[in-house]
Design a protein with these regions (language model features):
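N-terminal, active-site-proximal structural segment of metallo-dependent hydrolase catalytic domains
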Residues: 3, 16-88, 106, 272-275
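Metal-dependent phosphoester-hydrolase catalytic domains
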Residues: 178-187, 194-275
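Structured beta-strand-rich core segments of catalytic domains in phosphoester-bond hydrolases
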Residues: 70-156, 255-256
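Alpha-helical scaffold elements lining the catalytic groove of polysaccharide deacetylases
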Residues: 50-51, 164-178
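Active-site beta-strand/loop signature of hydrolases that rely on acidic residues for catalysis
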Residues: 28-34, 59-83, 112, 140, ...
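Surface-exposed cleft-lining segments at the edges of enzyme active sites
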Residues: 43-48, 123-130, 155-167, 196
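Sec-dependent N-terminal signal peptides
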Residues: 4-13
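Structural motif corresponding to alpha-helix initiation and N-cap regions
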Residues: 53-57, 83, 134, 170, ...
Length: 275
């Protein structure tokens, strides 16, 4: 028996399975598509100035309840109120550093992070070549306890029913994979718009669209196609957190007090030593 145990141990070392990743630190991350702070009414920037302080308090209460170190926001709007008198970055994200991408119609991606947990190394905005909407990804490279991690926030196309654009979303997913294929630590979050959409008809969920990421070696937070967009019936699994080289646990889907038409996704990310 002793020889058998020794033989198994040697085989395990030879295969590399004896190498154990050591957690250097962990951070709380949240992805949320805020629908331009529309108070769950599914319109753009519908909060009047008179309601600004009251509504900001509701958003802050929710954000504080999650207490994320890093927050990725899709469908962001710097104007929290309709007249722009209140700015979201100062009204909602006090204590966070910000990196906000360009606003292109309904598309605007932003990443907020606490300086006590992370420091920015680099950032970039990359627009997708194949698109109907002005879709892009915002990427910020953060130093977390000495480990560089790319955080990517994106919103993919939904108009793949249009002639000439049927493969746009597929190509956008491939672009994300290719651009971060050689990076050891990556967290990609966003509204991926998975599903078959035809105007005037119910959307057909298609969580299998995420398979391309798994085949490329990424992990999914929304592994079982949990619906995150309750406006649709059936509910669509639009939102996800997709990662590699980073551990994930404690995944939760949060209704966020109906402050958006999307659920938020929060999780614990484990940052490991080395590559």
């Amino acid at each position: 028996m002793r020889n058998i145990i020794f033989a198994v141990a040697v085989a395990c070392v030879a295969a590399g399975c004896a190498t154990k990743q050591v957690e250097r630190t962990s951070v709380r991350f949240m992805h949320w598509s805020v629908s331009h702070f529309s108070d769950g009414t599914y319109s753009v920037a519908s909060i009047p100035e008179s309601e600004g302080k009251r509504m900001a308090a509701k958003y802050v209460k929710f954000l504080n309840s999650v207490d994320a170190d890093i927050v990725g926001i899709t469908e962001y709007n710097e104007d929290f109120t309709t007249n722009g008198s209140m700015k979201a970055s100062t009204a909602l994200f006090k204590g966070y550093e910000k990196s906000v991408g360009p606003a292109k119609g309904d598309v605007c991606n932003a990443i907020f992070y606490k300086s006590a947990k992370a420091a920015k190394i680099d950032e970039k905005d990359v627009f997708f070549e194949n698109h109907f909407e002005d879709t892009y990804y915002k990427a910020v490279k953060l130093n977390i306890s000495g480990v560089p991690v790319w955080f990517v926030q994106t919103h993919l196309d939904s108009n793949t029913y249009l002639s000439g654009h049927r493969r746009d979303r597929e190509e956008q997913m491939k672009k994300l994979i290719e651009d971060f294929r050689n990076e050891p630590h990556v967290v990609i979050a966003g509204d991926f718009r998975v599903g078959v959409r035809i105007p005037g008809k119910p959307c057909f969920p298609a969580p299998e669209e995420y398979d391309v990421f798994e085949k490329a070696g990424f992990e999914l937070a929304n592994l079982f196609g949990t619906g995150t967009y309750p406006v649709d019936s059936p509910i669509q699994p639009l939102d996800n957190i997709i990662l590699k080289g980073v551990g994930i646990s404690e995944v939760r889907f949060l209704e966020a007090d109906h402050l958006s038409d999307h659920l938020a996704i929060s999780c614990k990310l484990s940052i490991y030593d080395g590559e």
